[in-house]
């Protein structure tokens, strides 16, 4: 096996990594230098806490897209005292030069673009394997896979029947990886679970899993819902998608978006940003929604709200953004027009019924771009095999908006690691004053100057002069 392939390597101090090519480290380091200038929130936290090192003693198992922006996050956590092991949370989202830069700096990382499902779960296990009888004590998650692996594995220690009847290829790989681990170490997962002080979750889908566990009483440690910080969901989800969706579509297909008919399925924050993205390049955009409030919002913004089933034969570009499954079904797929582009910007790959297309003829155009011939003779263009198009076919959100999200992540990790005993096994949101702090840290970079309240004005509206300025119930 070549040294540059994804084989386990040893660096100084016996740091291990599995990446595509360590020779990409210099390229990654150059892009990291640019990203740091665009991520003022993270750099401000480094400056504030680098001497205090509030994360000293934290052993963080990180499962989040291994991009250049994530590399800045990782190095911020390390600068604040943490030990880190990292894997990507998506088989296509890794930027190999970013992984190489992190590996070359001595941080264990297990990620490469285009992982198999077996590799994906093997790498997720690697972030939990600390050696020398040590275990992680914190999880930083995106989509809930690392958290879910620990919890499902703990259940399987007691009852292997939970690993029966997988529903898809991903579950086949997941269940197999758990069985293999249990054969080597029958109490592995329960040891990990008992050592975790808290988890911070990045995205909508992972947060939904946490709330589900909280509701049924199975959440084994405190969690902070980073996604619903205003400076995450209203920025990363909205403005990030507004730029990265069309970036992915254009890099993958080179098509002219102007004049096309596009359908965005789901009009939450991600859907809103996606719709703006397509409209901004001149597409006629329609929205499909189940929620009457979101549907009304879309209508008031000038989008036509439709049912997928009624328009499927007329749409040029399909984008799913729901967090649900089987949104675009086989029946929808086989009715699509010739050269329709089909993609997803939700976290998981099950919004589009890609499995139902397997019997048909596939022609790979380039990585993450497939031409599929339907029974009608029409061909559709499937992007990133139905996984995140902006990370599979492009490089994800810009650094500046990710600085908002990742500053929240660092603050959440500090809070749970240093104050974990104050939290029950429930899901929490960072308080308003920290949300406002994250925003403040990013204003200078874009030349924004805040107006200041007078004492009389502050008293009149009954808020502190320095904030927070809105109630917890306020909807931005």
From Swiss-Prot:
Q: Which CDD domains match?
A: SAHH
Q: Name one GO cellular component term.
A: cytosol
Q: Which residues bind NAD(+)?
A: 203-205, 237, 266-271, 289, 324, 345-347, 390
Q: What is its EC number?
A: 3.13.2.1
Protein's UniProt keywords contain Oxidoreductase: no
- What is the UniProt remark on how the cofactor binds and its stoichiometry? Binds 1 NAD(+) per subunit.
Where is it localised? Cytoplasm
Cofactor names = NAD(+)
User: Quick one: which pathway?
Assistant: Amino-acid biosynthesis; L-homocysteine biosynthesis; L-homocysteine from S-adenosyl-L-homocysteine: step 1/1
For the protein in the UniProt heading, the enzyme class is hydrolase
- Keyword terms of this UniProt record: Cytoplasm, Hydrolase, NAD, One-carbon metabolism
Instruction: List positions binding substrate.
Output: 67, 142, 202, 232, 236
The keyword Flavoprotein is assigned to this record: no
> What family does the database annotate?
Belongs to the adenosylhomocysteinase family.
Q: What is this protein called?
A: Adenosylhomocysteinase
Q: Which organism is it from?
A: Prochlorococcus marinus (strain MIT 9211)
